[in-house]
Amino acid sequence: MQWIYAKPGTQKEPVGRVDEAFIRKRLSREFAPELHSRIRREICEAIKSVEVRGKDIVLCSVIEQYVRRTLEYDLEIMKSRGLDHFTVLALEKNLPFEFEGSAFDGVVSGDAAVPSHRKYAFKGFIDRLDSFDDGTVRVVDYKTGKVSDDEAKVMGEEGNDTSKASAIFDSVFAEDSRERPKIALQFFIYNLMLTLNPEGRALVGGRKVTNEVYSVSGLFKNEHSEYSLPQGVIDKASEMLRSCLDGIFDIEKNPTFRRTGDTDVCNYCDFRMICGK
């Protein structure tokens, strides 16, 4: 997906200014063969095959429609706001950061122990960072898979309501929750990337950060759901994340830390062979 708005000959270097002519060229009949060829080539690379076969032909068609609808959707947003362009700031941007844990007794200096903090290293990629006006930076996450209604609710008014958003993060960090709103956690981490990473802060430049998921169903239903996380919710989520990480790394102070009771999540765990769950 990133190459749609990348400079020619690059994979991730953002093109910058995107206007109507740029989008219409990529939606044109003349561009269709190049779009089709590019998608097939990327699928072949992903599945390590020389050609697209069987169900992957269907996948190719779905992705092609998704790419075209993404371009149409961006044009619709631009026109609905009376703009002649928007700016792509970053594509598949890696913004690693360190998250500070709670204070604990550190080295002894004189007669007192100097408090220290455990550092947790995070690494992640933001699919797309763009801006439709001077006061806002938008995080866009591409979702070609299914997005449930429960997850989608964090993209609506709940995301802009402090009390509702706070309740969502109670669910994010609840033990053995099958209704965990993963999208809320994902955008919270993106927010930390843009706050705690120097390059991320520079990209934002003091502007308001909003979030939006480009899901297949959402795009074709024309559901425009852009939201921001209130600072109070970010602070609460940060404390919850800190408590969770501290508990993992300090078992003596957190005797309730245990293996999950929901074995479905074990399917995606890199440590399941060690755990033996």
Language model feature labels by segment:
Residues 1-277:
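RecB-family 4Fe-4S metal-dependent nuclease core
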